[in-house]
UniProtKB/Swiss-Prot annotation:
Binding annotation for substrate: R96, R106, R134, D219
Annotated family: Belongs to the isocitrate and isopropylmalate dehydrogenases family. LeuB type 1 subfamily.
Binding positions (Mg(2+)): D219, D243, D247
UniProt organism field: Chlorobium chlorochromatii (strain CaD3)
Assembly behavior: Homodimer.
Binding site for NAD(+): 76-89, 276-288
Role according to the record: Catalyzes the oxidation of 3-carboxy-2-hydroxy-4-methylpentanoate (3-isopropylmalate) to 3-carboxy-4-methyl-2-oxopentanoate. The product decarboxylates to 4-methyl-2 oxopentanoate.
Subcellular location as annotated: Cytoplasm
GO cellular component: cytosol
Protein name: 3-isopropylmalate dehydrogenase
Length: 352
């Protein structure tokens, strides 16, 4: 089996963490006997410095003609003062739009070795393992009309039936590979758009009777994620609610350096850590590569349909952490922090 991956390391620590992920991919090649073709392209500030644009046509075309895209991180102080349309964040929005990515997946998994790194008590977070499916292209961020004047501001929250259907199906399919439970988050007691959301999710559920479906209002969900995160398996929700809840979920794990993500469409998918480019530690071999390596696990699960390899990567991360290796962001007081390279090698050693 051959896989074609476009690697876009981006800026700051992106190059270092993607290098770690590529090293893991090379070890997986040896272990499983497949071939990975990796084509690297510039993106973000790194692309702007060379080509005068954050996202070139060549990079975009490569992303459209591969099996999956692996992104490191984009942005930094160097490019902050550019016009909005030339900023790295605008390029990220463009690539998501051009690839038709409509669902953002954010896992929240607490590794046993890191329960004390969470801001919550160990007995609350131990065993937490859920994923948030956030609709990415609809809702209040994109609804029209929108605007403001000196006296008022207005936005429109709109969802089309098909937008809800397609992300609901993704969530139900994922639940079948997990614990078989979906929690749909809305505000149907107040918002008509949430009433549509709930009706459509329940209609789709008719095709997935083997999966348990529950509903929860978003305000209660925010409380429950902090109070008892272990109760969740798959969360599916709209753009605004998902934006907020996925950040709340993320902090349960103890470090942004641990959190992978996936943005998925009907034909394409992009995988990336949720952390930024961290220019303050870039080039120092200090960054935590785990989120990027875990993003590769998501790639195998969702794009390549190899849940066995995805679980292998996740177990290797857990086993490496169990040996006591820690990068600076997850090191406890008195621990000796290891480098990006050393953490990568510790994970690879568990994959042999």
């Amino acid at each position: 089996m051959n896989y074609k991956i476009v690697s876009i390391p981006g800026d700051g620590i992106g190059t270092e963490v993607v290098a770690g992920a590529v090293a893991v991919l090379r070890q997986l090649e040896k272990k499983y006997g497949f071939t990975v073709e990796i084509e690297e392209h510039l993106f973000g500030g790194a692309s702007y410095d060379v080509h005068g644009e954050m996202l070139t046509d060549a990079t975009l075309e490569a992303c459209k003609n591969c099996d999956a895209v692996l992104l490191g991180a984009v942005g930094g102080p160097k490019w902050e003062n550019l016009p909005h349309e030339h900023k790295p964040e605008a390029a990220l929005l463009k690539i998501r739009k051009e690839l038709g990515l409509f669902a953002n997946l954010r896992p929240a998994k607490v590794y046993d070795a890191l329960v004390d790194a969470s801001s919550l008590k160990a007995d609350v977070v131990r065993g937490t393992d859920f994923v948030v499916f956030r609709e990415l292209t609809g809702g209040i961020y994109f609804g029209q009309p929108r605007g403001y004047d000196e006296n008022k501001g207005w936005n429109t929250m709109v969802y089309e039936k098909y937008e809800v259907e397609r992300i609901a199906r993704l969530a139900f399919e994922a639940a079948r590979q997990r614990q078989g439970r979906v929690m749909s988050i809305d505000k149907a007691n107040v918002l008509e758009v949430s009433q549509l959301w709930r009706n459509v999710v329940h209609a789709v559920h008719a095709d997935y009777q083997d999966v348990e479906l529950s509903d929860m209002y978003v305000d209660n969900a925010a409380m429950q994620i902090v109070r008892n995160p272990k109760q969740f398996d798959v969360i599916v929700t709209g753009n605004l609610f998902g934006d907020i809840l996925s950040d709340i979920s993320g902090m349960i794990t103890g470090s942004l350096g641990m959190l992978p993500s996936a943005s998925i469409g009907s034909k394409h998918a992009l995988y990336e850590p949720i952390h930024g480019s961290a220019p303050d530690i870039a080039g120092q071999n200090k960054a935590n590569p785990i989120a990027t390596i875990a993003s590769v696990a998501m790639m195998f699960e969702h794009s390549f349909k190899r849940t066995d390899i995805a679980r292998d990567i996740e177990q290797a991360i857990e086993a490496a952490l169990a040996t006591g290796v820690r990068t600076a962001d997850i090191a406890a007081a008195g621990d000796t922090a290891v480098s990006t390279t050393a953490m990568t090698e510790a994970i690879i050693s568990q994959l042999k």
